Structure formats: C-alpha cells, structure tokens
C-alpha cells in the first residue's frame, strides 16, 4: 500500500506577512505563506496548522471564556490561510503574551510543557486516524519564539509513537523558508496584505521577492525510538494532571497506569516480549468487548474497584486523554485582576499524560502482531512477530533472536 503525507505547520501572526515568490527545485509559488509551496511539494492529504491562543487578542471584541479564546484564535488564523488545500484543520495551543487592548491589559501565561504535551497529542492522534501508511512533514517557516522548537520536539516524538503503533519505518521531513528579505519601504508596502481582502496584496503590480523553501531534514524514524522518551518522575507518573483534586476520572486513570501502562512500557523497554504479550492480550481482548463491559467504556467518577485488573482497552486510554485535556481547559478560563485580564492555566499536564500516549502507541502496535482469541497462551509465532516492535535497534533485535532461538530449541525438545 502506497504512503500518503500529512503535513503540520506552525504559525505566528499571519496578518503582517508579505507576498513572496516561494521557490523549491526551480518552481515558484506566489503566496503570503509557505502553505501553497508546501502543498505543491508534498501534495499532503491533510494540513494541520498549529497556532497560539494569543491570536484571540486580534479579534475586535472582548474575550469571555476559554472556548471563546480558542474559537477567536481559530477564526482569525483561518481568514489568512489563502491556499487551495483539500483538507486542513487548525489546532489552538497555549501561548504567552502581554498586550494592551482598549482599557485593559491582557496577560496570557502558559507552561511550555503544556504546549509540548498538547502538540504531541494532536500530531499523534491526527496521524493514527489514517488507514494508509504515512509520511509526516513539518513546516516551521512561520513559527515564532518557542513555537518551532517545541513543535519540532513534539513532532519527532509523535513520529516515533506513530512508528511503533503501525510497526513501520516512518519518513519525516522538516521545511523552513529563508528569511524574508529587506526591501525598499514603498515596495514593502505594496506587498502587504490588503486589509479588506487579506489574500491579495495592496498593489496588484507588486513584484514579490524570491524566497527559497528549504528541506532542512529528511530522516526515517523507527519504532525503537520511542524509548528515547520513556522516563518519568515517580511522584507524578500515575496522574495526567498536577492537580487532580476535582478530577473525577483520576482514580481510574491511576489504576490504568499502575495496572497496564507502567508494566507494559517497562516490558517494552527491557525487550521482555513474553511479559509484553501477556500484558497486552487482556487489554486487546477488552477492545472487542461490549460497551457495557468494564474495559469497554468508563463513566466519569468510576473508581478503580469497578474495573477488573488488566481489562483496560485502547478506548479507555483515548477517553482518559480527552478528559484530561477537557479538565486542563477548564482551568484556563480568563479572569480579571484590576485592569488586567489574565489567561493562565491553573492546572498542568503531568507525566502520566505522556505515559498514556506511549501505552496507546505500544498497544496499538502489538494489536497487529498477536491474536487475542486465546487469552492465556502466548505462541512462539507471536513472540517472533513482536520482534518487529524493536525495529531500529540492532542490539535488542539480536538479543531477541537469541532468546527466540532458545525457545525454539526447547519446543523441539519437548515435541521429540
């Protein structure tokens, strides 16, 4: 099956970008952003834009809630897309700014680990929705401050998660355009956006400068690279948020992490494929259970005593990730302090959030390699299949080959 491309791009404020002739391999595209040249070069099935929630301040009216902040930021960015994309989405992540607006001072505060956690979630979840094998690309041309660095870190980690979830080598590419050149003031003015029609320049006879569009990185990411990102603070690994006092799902999440995530991730990192299969089989069997079964869906506030040990499923993980994000968003509501309107997260993502993502990826990969019809039995064929989880590490695959050879030898002796 041939692969397709999903592209991610990080944006600052697009209102002030000027028209350019972006060039790659001799071909040029006139546009206010690199989206058009990215689309031409990569022909992506889908493009996901990552923007900051601080763009909400560009809207004329006052912000009233965090949902309002997200919608204003998304609508503002969408107005400037100006590209013929078959499919695109805009994801709004937490930003940092202090800005005077009217009679108030708006202060946006954010923890950069929250930005990274949400970017990781969005990139990974967008990727696994596709049935066909993917190549992943990232454009950091228009990111500002911390955004390109954090998004690249998350993109790389998400590619590793995607690779293990699909048991494949995943090709990634990263692009960045050259800086926009300094022009004469009159020329620069002509190349600015027309405020009434932001997808056209102020002057139709403007001649935009050539700006090179560069491929910065092209690499293969292998499943084993997930282990680069495994490592948790003991005191926070069993929770997805720092403050769980009013989070009804916390006890169920804690149970899932204790009973499935930590043993599964540990077994994977150690190359303990027998334990890996024994841990995964009940969870994958629960995947096919009815919604009324304990492992099928979790009600808010359900305690860990309601769910039998090891009956957690991929669906449970997805539900808990979504609920953790919803709970985090509830703590980012705007509030007034004197003449300041502050948007600040009262909660933060804890290491357990990343542990759930890693569990989801590893479990998804195992799902394609073993049978769940016989819960108590792990076959030699399944162990040989599980070796595919370790693509990218010659050392681990060599050690597993030796262990499997021993088991094969013992099997032969038993059958003699």
Spans of model-derived segments:
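Long, low-complexity, Lys/Arg-enriched
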Residues: 1-135, 150, 156-416
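Acidic, metal-coordinating catalytic cores used for nucleic-acid/nucleotide bond scission
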Residues: 140-148
């Amino acid at each position: 099956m041939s692969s397709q491309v999903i592209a991610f791009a990080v944006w600052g404020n697009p209102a002030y970008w000027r028209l350019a002739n972006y060039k790659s391999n001799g071909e040029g595209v006139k546009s206010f952003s690199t989206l058009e040249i990215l689309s031409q070069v990569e022909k992506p099935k889908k493009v996901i834009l990552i923007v900051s929630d601080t763009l909400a301040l560009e809207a004329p009216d006052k912000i009233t809630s965090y949902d309002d902040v997200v919608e204003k930021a998304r609508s503002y960015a969408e107005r400037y897309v100006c590209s013929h994309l078959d499919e695109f989405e805009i994801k709004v992540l937490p930003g940092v700014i202090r800005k005077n607006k009217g009679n108030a001072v708006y202060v946006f505060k954010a923890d950069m680990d929250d930005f990274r956690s949400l970017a990781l979630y969005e990139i990974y979840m967008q990727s696994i929705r596709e049935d066909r094998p993917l190549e992943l690309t990232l454009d950091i041309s228009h990111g500002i401050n911390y955004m390109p660095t954090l998004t690249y870190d998350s993109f790389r980690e998400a590619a590793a998660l995607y690779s293990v979830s699909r048991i494949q080598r995943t090709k990634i590419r990263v692009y960045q355009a050259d800086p926009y050149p300094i022009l004469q003031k009159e020329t620069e003015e002509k190349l600015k956006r027309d405020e009434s029609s932001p997808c056209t320049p102020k002057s139709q006879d403007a001649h935009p400068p050539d700006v090179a569009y560069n491929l910065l990185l092209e690499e293969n990411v292998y499943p084993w690279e997930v282990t680069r990102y495994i490592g948790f603070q003991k005191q926070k690994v069993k929770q997805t948020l720092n403050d769980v006092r009013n989070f009804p799902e916390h006890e169920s999440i804690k149970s899932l992490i204790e009973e499935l995530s930590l043993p599964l991730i540990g077994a994977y990192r150690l190359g303990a494929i027998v334990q890996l299969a024994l841990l995964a089989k009940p969870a994958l069997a629960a995947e096919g259970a009815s919604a009324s079964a304990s492992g099928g869906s979790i009600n808010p506030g359900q305690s860990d005593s309601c769910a039998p040990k090891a009956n957690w499923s991929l669906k449970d993980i997805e539900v808990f990730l979504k609920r953790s994000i919803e709970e985090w968003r509830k703590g980012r509501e705007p509030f007034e302090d004197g003449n300041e309107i502050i948007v600040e997260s009262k909660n933060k993502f804890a290491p357990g959030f990343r542990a759930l993502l890693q569990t989801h990826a590893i479990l998804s990969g195992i799902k394609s390699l073993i049978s769940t019809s016989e819960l108590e039995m792990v076959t030699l064929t399944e162990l040989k299949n599980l070796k595919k989880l370790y693509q990218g590490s010659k050392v681990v695959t060599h050690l597993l080959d030796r262990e499997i050879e021993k088991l094969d030898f013992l099997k032969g002796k038993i059958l003699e």
